[in-house]
A protein has these predicted regions:
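Serine-hydrolase catalytic-loop signature spanning alpha/beta hydrolases and amidase-signature enzymes
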Residues: 42-52, 63
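Active-site donor-binding loop signature of nucleotide-sugar glycosyltransferases
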Residues: 14, 42, 68
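The conserved beta1-alpha1 loop
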Residues: 38-42, 109
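Short glycine-/acidic-enriched loop or helix-start segments at secondary-structure transitions
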Residues: 36, 49-50, 74-75
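Alpha/beta-hydrolase fold catalytic core
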Residues: 1-37, 58-61, 87, 101-103
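Active-site loop/oxyanion-hole signature of alpha/beta-hydrolase fold enzymes
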Residues: 22-28, 65-109
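Alpha-helical elements of Rossmann-like donor-binding domains used by nucleotide-donor carbohydrate transfer enzymes
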Residues: 7, 49-52, 56, 87-94
Length: 109
């Protein structure tokens, strides 16, 4: 995986699954959670889609791009079709909880 300057990749263990994320820390590594932007990719994509935007956002923001279940570096677990997209939203919530982020701005497509 090729990452653009300033972007790092890591795995986050949650109580649901192991999630791959890309991260660009703000100017201050202790950036407050409310200064966090979380990017969520669309179908047949991954967090890699967001790299250019991650570099372009203001440098005072912490930016995280999450790989949804079965995409990118995130564990491939089955999705319960009776729950609609709730498996995905629960995975995102579990990831933010594992990262200690209680408040964030969500962006997706």
């Amino acid at each position: 995986m090729t990452l653009l300057d300033g972007i790092t990749s890591r795995l986050v263990d949650t109580d649901r699954l192991t999630v791959g994320i890309l991260e660009r820390v703000g100017d201050n590594p202790a950036t407050a959670p409310e200064q966090t932007v979380v990017l969520i990719h669309g179908n047949v994509s991954s967090s890699l889609f967001w790299q250019e935007l991650m570099q372009d956002l203001p440098s005072d923001l912490r930016v995280i791009a999450i790989d949804l279940r079965g995409f990118g570096e995130t564990e491939s677990l089955s999705v319960d079709a009776t729950r609609g997209v709730r498996d995905f939203s629960d995975d995102v919530h579990a990831t933010l909880t594992a990262l200690g982020i209680e408040t964030a701005h969500l962006v997706g497509w």
